[in-house]
Amino acid sequence: MTVFVVFGGHGKVALLFTKIATEAGHIVYNVVRDYVQNEDIEKVHGRTSVCSLEKATPNDIAQFLAEIHPDVVIFAAGAGGKGGPERTRAVDYEGAIKVYDAMRIAGIRRLIMISAIDNRDMSQPPPPYYTAADIELSEKIHQSIGTYYHYKYLADQELVRRSSDIDWTILRPSGMTDEKGSGKVALGKISINCMMSRENVARTVLLFALDNQSIHLVVDMTDGNVPIYKAIAGFVVKGESSYTYSV
């Protein structure tokens, strides 16, 4: 049995993760900003914890983590485009930094960061395996939701800088759908012009969270043809991140 704390615990992926994890016998604490979200969490057998990443201090979060002492922290929080650039910065970047600080204070090491495919430094050339279609799509995506990507990149970059304190894995799913998961994925250096079911995302997050051989790997992922556990095993053996953050 593994104990998880999920920041952003009311999101679609978080709720699917909670359902899958609790059905497998694990314990999940879903951290949300408002107790009104409790009903949805209870339906999937999660345990609601109220903590606003915008208002809490690292010490507040550390106290909460110390009381639960989870085996794994999952960061799935995000402003979701609500509240403008200031709120995106406050949740996606500053909220993440608070969690990193809190984990260090509380002595918790394992973190799964749910990021996004193509989260990269746009001042640098695109990855060499990108096709012309990938490059065109990348430019459109970053023009559309550049603020999100900017702060998500800074959060991921800072996490990599803290590798001595945090045993992180950064998971970067492609665009997501609400279709039923096939249980099969593609991991690694993949096209960004693809989609992934949220159920497959949640199942992949769980299996990576339970795999301590994936520490300090960056993983791009989408729906594919390989069973999730086999895809993870192959990725871990290869040990090559999908992207390298400059630090």
UniProtKB/Swiss-Prot annotation:
Any one GO cellular component localisation term in the record: nucleus
Positions in coiled-coil regions: none
GO biological process, one term: heme catabolic process
A Pfam family annotated for this UniProt entry: NAD_binding_10
Key word Nucleus present: yes
Location of this chain's protein in the cell: Cytoplasm; Nucleus
Swiss-Prot/TrEMBL keywords: Cytoplasm, Nucleus
Homology family: Belongs to the UPF0659 family.
Protein name: UPF0659 protein C216.03
Organism, as annotated: Schizosaccharomyces pombe (strain 972 / ATCC 24843) (Fission yeast)
